[in-house]
């Protein structure tokens, strides 16, 4: 049996082919799995569980089918969908995980994160993250009208794109990659803090398996891929793990 781990699908009505691929993945691969973990950014935008969305409705129905069949489903919020709450979780049948958290995968304690916590060289993003994850901010935000929340989210997305463009203009390609990737010292500190030898995260859209030494321990950091040009899934079992790509329909 296998545990499947994915992230960064960024499901959006403007990219129906990705939603189609995800639904096919659920039908064809999740039914026989030990568990499914979604490590954030399942959706491109999420402004509250009361947000009307045909894509979210299709996803919740598909996930519920597997939950009802007994497949454990887990969701860790990302930077795009950190407002996914208890109502949607109950409808879909998944458990919301804290970021970060340690889970046991076939006897191997494994640290799961969305991944943005490790990108501390991007100071502006970390400041925005701290503001928007504040419980008081979230409570106040969710009292606003849907239209006001949507306007804020759209503006935040435009600001994010502008920030990324600015970083590209102000830095050479090597420095830009460094700023927008994880900070090695933070990775090492996270390994040491949680006392594990394996870490899995998404966010950076740079799928890879990294081997490193932390305090004389051999550690593995697995980076999940995004679902833009193809799908990406990490398959974990008692024998190890494999990163696989999924072809988009058509």
Swiss-Prot record:
Keywords: Cell inner membrane, Cell membrane, Hydrolase, Lipid A biosynthesis, Lipid biosynthesis, Lipid metabolism, Manganese, Membrane, Metal-binding. Pfam families: Metallophos. Substrate binds at residues 79-80, 122, 160, 172, 175, 203. Mn(2+) 2 binds at residues 41, 79, 114, 203. The keyword Metal-binding applies. The keyword Membrane applies. Its main location: membrane. InterPro entries: Calcineurin-like_PHP_ApaH (IPR004843), LpxH-like (IPR043461), Metallo-depent_PP-like (IPR029052), UDP-diacylglucosamine_Hdrlase (IPR010138). Pathway: Glycolipid biosynthesis; lipid IV(A) biosynthesis; lipid IV(A) from (3R)-3-hydroxytetradecanoyl-[acyl-carrier-protein] and UDP-N-acetyl-alpha-D-glucosamine: step 4/6. GO terms for biological process: lipid A biosynthetic process. It is found in: Cell inner membrane. It is a peripheral membrane protein. Mn(2+) 1 binds at residues 8, 10, 41, 205. Belongs to the LpxH family. NCBIfam families: lipid_A_lpxH, PRK05340.1. This is UDP-2,3-diacylglucosamine hydrolase. It comes from Xylella fastidiosa (strain Temecula1 / ATCC 700964). The lineage of its organism: Bacteria, Pseudomonadati, Pseudomonadota, Gammaproteobacteria, Lysobacterales.
């Amino acid at each position: 049996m296998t545990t499947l781990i994915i992230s960064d699908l960024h499901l959006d009505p403007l990219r129906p082919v990705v939603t189609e691929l995800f639904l096919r993945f659920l039908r064809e691969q999740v039914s026989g799995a030990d568990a499914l973990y979604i490590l954030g950014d399942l959706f491109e935008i999420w402004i509250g569980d009361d947000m009307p969305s045909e894509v979210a409705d299709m996803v919740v129905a598909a996930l519920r089918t597997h939950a009802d069949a007994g497949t454990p489903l887990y969701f860790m919020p990302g930077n795009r969908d950190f407002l996914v709450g208890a109502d949607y979780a109950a409808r879909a049948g998944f458990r919301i995980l804290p970021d970060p958290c340690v889970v046991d995968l076939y006897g191997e304690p494994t640290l799961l994160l969305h991944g943005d916590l490790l990108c501390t060289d991007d100071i502006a993003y970390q400041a925005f993250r701290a503001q928007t994850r504040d419980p008081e901010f979230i409570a106040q935000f969710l009292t606003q009208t849907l239209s006001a929340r949507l306007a804020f989210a759209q503006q935040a997305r435009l600001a994010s794109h502008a920030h990324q463009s600015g970083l590209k203009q102000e830095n050479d390609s090597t420095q830009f990659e460094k700023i927008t990737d994880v900070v090695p010292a933070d990775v090492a500190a996270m390994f040491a803090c949680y006392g594990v030898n394996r870490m899995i995260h998404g966010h950076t859209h740079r799928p890879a398996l990294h081997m490193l030494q932390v305090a004389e321990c051999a550690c593995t950091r697995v980076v999940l891929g995004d679902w833009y040009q193809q799908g990406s899934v990490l398959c974990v079992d008692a024998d190890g793990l494999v990163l696989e790509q999924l072809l988009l329909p058509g």
